[in-house]
Curated annotation (Swiss-Prot):
Record note on what altering residue 51 to T does: In CMD2D; uncertain significance
Role according to the record: Heart- and skeletal muscle-specific component of the ribosome, which regulates muscle function. Component of the large ribosomal subunit in striated muscle cells: replaces the RPL3 paralog in the ribosome in these cells. The ribosome is a large ribonucleoprotein complex responsible for the synthesis of proteins in the cell. Inhibits myotube growth and muscle function.
Alphabetical keyword list: Cardiomyopathy, Disease variant, Ribonucleoprotein, Ribosomal protein
Gene3D superfamilies: 3.30.1430.10, Ribosomal protein L3, domain 3, Translation factors
Spans annotated as Disordered: 1-35, 387-407
Biased amino acid composition, Basic residues: 1-31
GO cellular component: cytosolic large ribosomal subunit; membrane; ribosome
Self-association and partners: Component of the large ribosomal subunit in striated muscle cells.
Protein name listed in UniProt: Ribosomal protein uL3-like
Family: Belongs to the universal ribosomal protein uL3 family.
UniProt key word Chaperone: no
GO biological process: negative regulation of myotube differentiation; regulation of striated muscle tissue development; translation
Length: 407
């Protein structure tokens, strides 16, 4: 019998305890990037929805590496990011105990998909949310008070954040209730931030005004839920030998006799997945525009490159599984991210200043795969499939409609 190594590193990370279900569905930003007044005023985060994954082909441009100027096939994630709507401004003052909310000002008109978030049952409610806040914009006294509030923000506040919500009507979901989030404004003075937010109330903010091509960002989301799992699946502990009594996928020793209790560091069965996680340094491969009009023509070739000039959309044949079509702006991120399909994803500007070759590398894609994700796809576009497979019966019926003869 061979020698057994009696010392081994523990299984599982203790830095994320307790492994329980997250009480929030949307990723929360707990730390914002450091403010730089020398930069123009800008948002520091954005909201999107995970659509699915595909792969790309590109040429690596990192001087000094052996793989430089070689082609690489890399997996990417598509996050659909319709424009956000600014509906409010929040000012924070600095106190000895941290930041405290000073003033909150909402816009005059709020859409129903935003107001639905404040009701548990929208259908049975009286739908009177924000009626008093909206009246302030209409009478003379209310307008004067609003100007005083904006002036007080400029005078006393240290941090300015805007309240934004997503547009569910632009997405292929049944859900009508929008996701609402506070996003911090960085850059410029406090007066410039308040003026920026005041000028964009009830207006849309696109994703390309927040992030840029080849930028490194952070992704905050809730992971895919996997229910109650055993200790082997949850903590990746070693399976016991075959002849072990009463099961193999267990932990044989759960601690000493004394202290007479099971310690918190002992691997146990329980909830796996649906945890709040922040993943740093995700590279943006492309920020694509949805279908739009240019010179009177509808442009949908947001998956074309300088090498692959085929007019094709980022949506693969048959759509993304369990999601559908991507008909809005999108962000293409390198690798995988947390969450399942249709999960709301929080994209935040990176907290760090990056100087590595990999972080500052300019991304130039040669090819983006748009084959069907339901099986072993081989065709990039529907036209390519039709040219190879031949016309279907429905296409022939459209071209030569049958003429009914007189009886």
């Amino acid at each position: 019998m061979s020698h057994r190594k009696f010392s081994a590193p523990r299984h599982g990370h203790l830095g994320f305890l307790p492994h329980k279900r997250s009480h929030r569905h949307r990723g929360k930003v707990k730390t914002w990037p450091r403010d730089d007044p020398s930069q123009p005023v800008h948002l520091t985060a954005f909201l999107g929805y995970k659509a699915g994954m595909t792969h790309t082909l590109r040429e690596v441009h990192r001087p000094g590496l052996k793989i430089s100027k070689r082609e690489e096939v890399e997996a990417v994630t598509i996050v659909e990011t319709p424009p956000l709507v600014v509906v409010g401004v929040v000012g924070y003052v600095a106190t000895p105990r941290g930041l405290r909310s000073f003033k909150t000002i909402f816009a005059e008109h709020l859409s129903d998909e935003c107001r639905r978030r404040f009701y548990k049952d929208w259908h049975k409610s009286k739908k009177k949310a924000f009626t008093k806040a909206c009246k302030r914009w209409r009478d003379t006294d209310g307008k004067k008070q609003l100007q005083k509030d904006f002036a007080a923000m400029k005078k006393y506040c240290k941090v300015i954040r805007v309240i934004v919500h997503t547009q569910m009507k632009l997405l292929p979901f049944r859900q009508k209730k929008a996701h609402i989030m506070e996003i911090q404004l960085n850059g410029g003075t406090v007066a410039e931030k308040v003026a920026w937010a005041q000028a964009r109330l009830e207006k849309q903010v696109p994703v390309h005004s927040v992030f840029s091509q080849s930028e490194v960002i952070d992704v905050i989301a809730v992971t895919k839920g996997r229910g109650v799992k055993g200790v082997t699946s949850r903590w990746h502990t070693k399976k016991l030998p075959r002849k072990t009594h009463k099961g193999l996928r267990k932990v044989a020793c759960i601690g000493a006799w004394h202290p007479a209790r099971v310690g918190c560091s002992i691997a146990r069965a329980g909830q796996k997945g649906y945890h709040h996680r922040t993943e740093l340094n995700k590279k943006i491969f492309r920020i694509g525009r949805g279908p739009h009009m240019e010179d009177g023509k509808l442009v949908k070739n947001n998956a074309s490159t300088s090498y692959d000039v085929t007019a094709k959309s980022i949506t693969p044949l048959g759509g993304f599984p369990h999601y559908g079509e991507v008909n809005n702006d999108f962000v293409m991120l390198k690798g995988c991210i947390a969450g399942t399909k249709k999960r709301v994803i929080t994209l935040r500007k990176s907290l760090l200043v990056h100087h590595s070759r990999q972080a500052v590398e300019n991304i130039e894609l040669k090819f983006i795969d748009t084959t069907s994700k339901f099986g072993h796809g081989r065709f990039q576009t529907a036209q390519e499939k039709r040219a190879f497979m031949g016309p279907q019966k429905k296409h022939l019926e459209k071209e030569t409609p049958e003429t009914s003869g007189d009886l």
